[in-house]
Amino acid sequence: MEVLELKPVKNKQVIAYMFAKENSMALQSTDPDLLTKFLENKGINFVTVDFDIDMKEFSRTTFAKVLDKIGINYYQVDIPEYAMGYLYEEIIEKEELLTGLTEEYISLEDRDSYKGQSLKNWIDLINIEIHEKENILSLRIRPMWIVKKMLDIAKNCQEVDVSFVHFVQTDICEDICSQVVELLREYNVKVIQYNKKHTIKNIIF
């Protein structure tokens, strides 16, 4: 099993280009020529993706076919299932406790009683704990795993100057892109983000 340990890439200059795409369907409408031109001009060594899509399905997109044609490897970056399962166990336990407490609270004849108020306070507290644990998992732990995988791939590249592109689903980006960028920069990766303010015909594929 992998250990969540982030280390900077030694003796290499690493550049990350980040793009947000609306969804996986946008990858199917990719302009092959524009994508190829961008990847070749920037000397891209590999591509990482963070989309809600099965990689077998992804491999059939126009986007993936372009990468295959020009010999650029692509990787899905995410928290491993075993790590997700381990961390999510605590959340499931809290949710089961919440269900039991809620059922007990609903069954009370006098919800304004001391017992009713105590149950209500407990339910509110459990709800807060669940929300906090979900935020820690999705907004802190997951970005760390994503960056770890990016750094590991960069370390395995033979080149001294390593460039990669990270494509991420827009709604996912809204949640975690700032954390991913911050972590990459913390580990000496130069990050260049592209958004709708840039010239569309030059950078949107």
For each predicted feature, which ranges?
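Compositional signal for N-terminal targeting/processing segments
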Residues: M1-F205
